[in-house]
Amino acid sequence: MTDPHPTEGELAILHVLWKLGAPATVREVHEELLRSKDTAYTTVLKMLTIMSDKKLVRRDETERSHRYMPLHSEPAVQSSMLKTFLQNTFSGSAFKLVQSALADDRASAEELEAIGKLIAQAKSRRRK
């Protein structure tokens, strides 16, 4: 299976499917999307059809209302998208990514503490 690279709209639908945690109908996905963005039912239907063709979701046609489920986990999609973003935006440099993320002082003290622990864990794994 290839690395998933969903569009922004496809990613919004995947977030809904991951949140619901079970196969969902177009109507269920549409209702959830309406909470944050005005989206037509037919648009959601068309996007899910395209996503099925792209192997981002699987369509279960055993019931009258087809149900859709993601074919990739949220961490797998995040990892794939991050690798592409890192390469395209920061020439593959994790240092430049972190430097940029921390440059505007948006990280809270708690987040900085957690980041420090992650760095220590990464260093420990490298020594082994």
Language-model regions, residue ranges each:
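Short, cationic-aromatic polyanion-contact patches
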Residues: 4-9, 62-81
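Pre-recognition alpha-helix immediately N-terminal to the DNA-recognition helix
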Residues: 8-16, 28
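Short helix-to-turn junction characteristic of helix-turn-helix DNA-binding domains
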Residues: 17-21, 101
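Short, hydrophobic-biased segments on the C-terminal half of alpha helices
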Residues: 45-49
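Short beta-strand "wing" residues that participate in macromolecule-binding interfaces
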Residues: 59
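Amphipathic alpha-helical dimerization/coiled-coil segments
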Residues: 81-125
